[in-house]
């Protein structure tokens, strides 16, 4: 469960950091937006190292489902774009995949 909370925090940082670049390049915001953006992206990378997984690739794969759902929620909360049924179905499929990767029974390598 710790990984799930870590992934949620990481998603917030990644999306906020990337949005800072989006705001600068696409919305004509000040380059000063890049400062908190880069800090958020650095915190995102650090948070992913806290995932309860011995393998980086598996942690990143599981994180992907959380990222997708979080990005849709960001679009709704920050950009006012309510997810449609296809967004919700797609995110649900990704979260099922994330659950299989994160919570599936594992045997530890020797």
UniProtKB/Swiss-Prot annotation:
The chain crosses the membrane at residues 4-24, 31-51, 59-79, 85-105. GO terms for cellular component: plasma membrane. It comes from the Bacteria. It is found in: Cell inner membrane. Pfam families: UPF0060. It is a multi-pass membrane protein. The keyword Endoplasmic reticulum does not apply. InterPro entries: UPF0060 (IPR003844). Keywords: Cell inner membrane, Cell membrane, Membrane, Transmembrane, Transmembrane helix. Its main location: membrane. Belongs to the UPF0060 family. This is UPF0060 membrane protein RPA3838. It comes from Rhodopseudomonas palustris (strain ATCC BAA-98 / CGA009). The lineage of its organism: Bacteria, Pseudomonadati, Pseudomonadota, Alphaproteobacteria, Hyphomicrobiales.
């Amino acid at each position: 469960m710790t990984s799930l909370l870590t992934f949620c925090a990481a998603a917030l940082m990644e999306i906020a950091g990337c949005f800072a670049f989006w705001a600068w390049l696409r919305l004509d915001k000040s380059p000063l937006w890049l400062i908190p953006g880069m800090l958020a992206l650095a915190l995102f990378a650090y948070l992913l190292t806290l995932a309860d997984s011995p393998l980086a690739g598996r942690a990143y794969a599981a994180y992907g489902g959380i990222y997708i759902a979080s990005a849709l929620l960001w679009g709704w909360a920050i950009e006012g774009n309510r997810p449609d049924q296809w967004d919700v179905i797609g995110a649900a499929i990704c979260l099922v995949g994330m659950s299989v990767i994160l919570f599936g029974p594992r045997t530890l390598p020797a």
